[in-house]
From Swiss-Prot:
One of its GO terms (biological process) is regulation of smooth muscle contraction. It comes from Macroscelides proboscideus (Short-eared elephant shrew). The keyword tRNA-binding does not apply. This is Alpha-2B adrenergic receptor. PANTHER family: ADRENERGIC RECEPTOR-RELATED G-PROTEIN COUPLED RECEPTOR, ALPHA-2B ADRENERGIC RECEPTOR. InterPro entries: ADR_fam, ADRA2B_rcpt, GPCR_Rhodpsn, GPCR_Rhodpsn_7TM. Residues 279-290 have a biased composition (Acidic residues). Disulfide bonds join 72-151. The record marks 79 as: Implicated in ligand binding. Residues 193-303 are annotated as: Disordered. The keyword Disulfide bond applies. GO terms for molecular function: alpha2-adrenergic receptor activity; epinephrine binding.
Length: 387
């Protein structure tokens, strides 16, 4: 019965991970650079299912190591290599999720296939550094008992503790702290969005008069509109007669440059205190401010009702605002794409948190008992069947 269950798990592992690799390599929607982590992780799991589990099953069923001693040393090194690689891959994925959520604007521009491949190479090098010492340093080996040969993991305390810390406990601690940080960021973002949904202004934000779009009537002209650009024609020393319509040439006077300073669209204003206050809040502000996230003046920062579209120039006139440049549709489409991307990042982070939590719970008993045998081998020895 055990052999049948393990055989089914081997086939299921190979088939499922092969589908993951095939989907990422063939589906255009899954060709994002971060999905290379899943390809490498699936490859490590396939190697475990093909090169490790069958020999472990044979060793358990026969009760001794049927294969040669050389293959035993290689088999143990590959076992540590592939299992450590799987765990460190999950740690790297959790860090990638954290950077994608906390530093969305900055990290997404740096998340290139080359960068992801370098991280994957680092993961495999860490796993190799943990698995190779038993092959290089044999240490004081106990003589083999007479009878059938056995193939066991390295029993020296220094290697047990160092490999357990590097393979499991350090990555596990990093994953727990990272997902706790992601949870706090999501909770803070949700609590910030609630008062703004009710119409309450942000702390420290003064109430600004509402500027109506072009073509609507304005009952009371705000004082902010009385500028050299507000009364067209006065820059040349005369005004338009009553009843004469304004032309586009009159609205834009070359002799009167706009008095509002330009604010870049690349998010620099947020770093200088216009919108966000920390890298973790950049993604939140990108979603909160909406498609009109870049204000025409510092007084209009982070106020959705007063924002012009991104990439547009705003001129104040007697009738309200005149928008020059790119239209609202393009800016709104870009904002919705960014918001959808951030939503996918958060949803994928939740799924990965569940998967990693189950993975950690499955690995913890082994590494705990394995380390406990090195700390107190006489009094804390775990029964062989339970191990």
């Amino acid at each position: 019965a055990i052999a049948a269950v393990i055989t089914f798990l081997i086939l299921f592992t190979i088939f499922g991970n092969a589908l993951v690799i095939l989907a990422v390599l063939t589906s255009r929607s899954l060709r994002a650079p971060q999905n290379l982590f899943l390809v490498s992780l699936a490859a490590a799991d396939i190697l475990v299912a093909t090169l490790i589990i069958p020999f472990s099953l044979a060793n358990e069923l026969l009760g001794y190591w049927y294969f040669r001693h050389t293959w035993c040393x290689v088999y143990l090194a590959l076992d540590v290599l592939f299992c450590t690689s799987s765990i460190v891959h999950l740690c790297a994925i959790s860090l990638d999720r954290y950077w994608a959520v906390s530093r969305a604007l900055e990290y997404n521009s740096k998340r290139t296939p080359r960068r992801i491949k370098c991280i994957i190479l680092t993961v495999w090098l860490i796993a190799a550094a943990i698995s190779l010492p038993p092959l290089i340093y044999k240490g004081d080996q106990d003589p083999q008992p007479r009878g059938r040969p056995q193939c066991k993991l390295n029993q020296e305390a220094w290697y047990i503790l160092s490999s357990s810390i590097g393979s499991f406990f350090v990555p596990c601690l990093i994953m727990i702290l990272v997902y706790l940080r992601i949870y706090l960021i999501a909770k803070r973002s949700s609590s910030r969005r609630k008062p703004r949904a009710k119409g309450x202004p942000r702390e420290g934000e003064s109430k600004q008069p509402q500027l109506r779009p072009v073509g609507t009537s304005v009952s009371a002209r705000p004082p902010a509109l009385t500028s050299p650009l507000a009364v067209t024609g006065e820059a040349n020393g005369h005004s338009k007669p009553t009843g004469e319509r304004e032309t586009p040439e009159d609205l834009v006077s070359p002799a009167s440059p706009p008095s509002w300073p330009a604010i870049p669209n690349s998010g620099q204003g947020r770093k200088e205190g216009v919108c966000g206050t920390s890298p973790e809040e950049e993604a939140e502000e990108e979603e909160e401010c909406g498609p009109e996230a870049v204000p025409a003046s510092p007084a209009l920062a982070c106020s959705p009702s007063l924002q012009p579209p991104q990439g547009s120039r705003v001129l104040a006139t007697l009738r309200g605002q005149v928008l020059l440049g790119r239209g609202v549709g393009t800016a709104r489409g870009q904002w919705w794409r960014r918001r959808a991307q951030l939503t996918r990042e958060k949803r994928f982070t939740f799924v990965l948190a569940v998967v990693i939590g189950v993975f950690v719970l499955c690995w913890f008993p082994f590494f705990f008992s394995y380390s406990l045998g090195a700390i107190c081998p006489q009094h804390c020895k775990v029964p062989h069947g339970l191990f």
